[in-house]
């Protein structure tokens, strides 16, 4: 049977950046890796209602910088920044070094693989029909400019006795093209009948220029929008 390599792993360093960017010697590598895991586990649990996309970690000069990519930055920041300050102190305790937390807003959650997968799982847990949830996710992604999307759900769909896998695809999803920008994510829906797995592949177009072009596009997307000039003459 044909098996699929992880779409994100095979593109690391080509069109996908690493989620943790730091260098450590042999003695400290395992400790840093484990503290990264603990930080991600803690933040994922604390921000389960904040539409969390991904967490990137950097370690400059005996400190840690965590960037939280979310579709709902207001929920993460909290009133007057109280919630994000609590998170910063908790991360500093977990890692044992000074911590800094940055918030990055996901402008189009319908084109983010993790957010789409989480949206489908939340609908399945609310007993929405799986076909309706899949079709809605596909239509929203294509409407906002995706070149292609594939959604797969597997488990006891609709409470059936025998588990099965169903998928729905629209557009192109070229998994073998390394320059293709494929956003892949998984999630799990915990229902009364058992666990239903959800996989999402979103093809956003081809990247020419490698990782440098991806980073430049991401920086441009995060830049604040310039206010539009009003050319109309103001009345007295």
From Swiss-Prot:
One GO term describing the cellular component: cytosolic small ribosomal subunit
PANTHER family in alphabetical order: 30S/40S RIBOSOMAL PROTEIN S3, SMALL RIBOSOMAL SUBUNIT PROTEIN US3C
Key words of the record: Ribonucleoprotein, Ribosomal protein, RNA-binding, rRNA-binding
InterPro entries: KH_dom, KH_dom-like_a/b, KH_dom_type_2, KH_sf_prok-type, Ribosomal_S3_C_sf, Ribosomal_uS3_bac-typ, Ribosomal_uS3_C, Ribosomal_uS3_CS
PROSITE patterns: KH_TYPE_2, RIBOSOMAL_S3
Domain KH type-2 as annotated: residue spans: 39-107
Protein name: Small ribosomal subunit protein uS3
Membership in a protein family: Belongs to the universal ribosomal protein uS3 family.
GO molecular function annotations of the record: mRNA binding; rRNA binding; structural constituent of ribosome
GO biological process: translation
Pfam families associated with the record: KH_2 (PF07650), Ribosomal_S3_C (PF00189)
Organism: Aeromonas salmonicida (strain A449)
Keyword Transferase: no
Functional note: Binds the lower part of the 30S subunit head. Binds mRNA in the 70S ribosome, positioning it for translation.
Complexes and interactors: Part of the 30S ribosomal subunit. Forms a tight complex with proteins S10 and S14.
